[in-house]
Amino acid sequence: MTLNLNPLETNLVNLVIVIGLLFWFLRGFLGGILERRRAAILQELQDAESRLKTATENLSQAQSELAAAQQKAEKIRADGQARAAGIRAEGEKRTISVMAAIKAGADADAEADAARIKDSLRREAALAAIDKALAVLPARLDASAQAKLIDSTIKNLENA
């Protein structure tokens, strides 16, 4: 074997030896680092899967709670509409009864006014008839007829 003094070939051999030695000595060190990194990645994946599972369960629970809340809201809305309809109907009944009372009061007032007007007209008619009778009576009655009328009126009053 001859000694190779070619620097390029010699460096390649030296590099192969150095790389081999580095690989041999650092294999445990780099392997440990890589193994720890692999374990950390696996742990992170497991944590992510568990968080995904928890999030999925929470989402499912939230969706069921949302559905229950929507049903409750719908029931509350329906109850509110029913209550509003009842209140509206009650208000209409009260309005009708108040209107009937007002109409009855107005009818009573109208009847009272009509009765008052009738009485007033009767009184005026009676006064007019009396005035006319008093105006015509002295010319038609002489003293003897007047005495007879007075006597018959007194007898009627005594019998009554």
Swiss-Prot record:
Membrane association type: Single-pass membrane protein
* Keywords (A to Z) from UniProt: ATP synthesis, CF(0), Hydrogen ion transport, Ion transport, Membrane, Thylakoid, Transmembrane, Transmembrane helix, Transport
- Per the record, the domain of life is Bacteria
According to the UniProt entry, its GO molecular function terms are: proton-transporting ATP synthase activity, rotational mechanism
Does this UniProt record's set of keywords contain Mitochondrion?
no
The record's Gene Ontology cellular component field reads: plasma membrane-derived thylakoid membrane; proton-transporting ATP synthase complex
Q: Where in the cell is it found?
A: Cellular thylakoid membrane
Membrane-spanning residues: 15-35
Query: Its function?
Result: F(1)F(0) ATP synthase produces ATP from ADP in the presence of a proton or sodium gradient. F-type ATPases consist of two structural domains, F(1) containing the extramembraneous catalytic core and F(0) containing the membrane proton channel, linked together by a central stalk and a peripheral stalk. During catalysis, ATP synthesis in the catalytic domain of F(1) is coupled via a rotary mechanism of the central stalk subunits to proton translocation.
Q: Which family does it belong to?
A: Belongs to the ATPase B chain family.
Listed under subunit, the entry gives: F-type ATPases have 2 components, F(1) - the catalytic core - and F(0) - the membrane proton channel. F(1) has five subunits: alpha(3), beta(3), gamma(1), delta(1), epsilon(1). F(0) has four main subunits: a(1), b(1), b'(1) and c(10-14). The alpha and beta chains form an alternating ring which encloses part of the gamma chain. F(1) is attached to F(0) by a central stalk formed by the gamma and epsilon chains, while a peripheral stalk is formed by the delta, b and b' chains.
Q: What is this protein called?
A: ATP synthase subunit b
Organism whose genome encodes this protein: Synechococcus sp. (strain CC9605)
